[in-house]
């Protein structure tokens, strides 16, 4: 794996359940991994006992003072502080590129086979190659970040999947040369790709690969308590506040419905017209 790259696993309150670490190694990743733990985590010492120098700590209050929570709640329960700390942490460990991952991934998969046919193939030895290719894409294009797809991106199977989507959620390949800030205590990934995408910044999801994540609220720790306290109703309205011209509230689900945001992409981001539509010049 390239030496200027590292993986940051953002984790809180569950040192015995960092599934992502084990899955990365099982998938063939040979590079550096760091667990990003905040200074308010009561289980921080247990992380250090298990992972030693692979644990990086940051001050939540310092990060909060430099960003927009999107609310006035009197607490700091959110992953957003860890997300925004990663650029400083990357410089600290001498990395130019990094990927932010949550701590509860059970698998990484390729969604197309070698003949470019729609498939589902578990990654067992080529994780270095996947992450290196995402870094090269970041290097050679003007994107702010690139994400690995999630299961919901493939609803509709081969009829619904496409090779690129103009959003980024959950995993983020970033560079210290192109820093940006996540905004909003909840729904921070959506708030960020919509509010910055609105200004022409590029966020992409690569559909060639997918990560599998535990269902929200299934495991204690992380953001579970925040979601249980406020629910998806409050969560979705953060994005309405940041981008009211292109966000509305709806419901999703089959039998058990829940409130969720809906993005109108026609209003959300600038689009590039084909050159054939350009007006002639005198």
PLM ranges: what are they?
Residues 38-99, 106-119:
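Active-site-proximal specificity loops/subdomain of glycosyltransferases
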Residues 2-5, 15-16, 184, 190-282:
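C-terminal catalytic/acceptor-binding lobe
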Residues 9-28, 40-48:
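Short, well-formed alpha-helical segments that are part of the catalytic scaffolds
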Residues 106-195:
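Conserved catalytic core of nucleotide-sugar-dependent glycosyltransferases
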Residues 3-9, 24, 31-35:
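Hydrophobic targeting segments
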Residues 97-102, 144-149, 203-207, 248-251:
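A structural signal for short, well-ordered beta-strand segments and their strand-loop junctions
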Residues 18-21, 44-48, 109-112, 156-162, ...:
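A short acidic (Asp/Glu
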Residues 8-10, 36, 101, 206:
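Short hydrophobic segments within beta-strands
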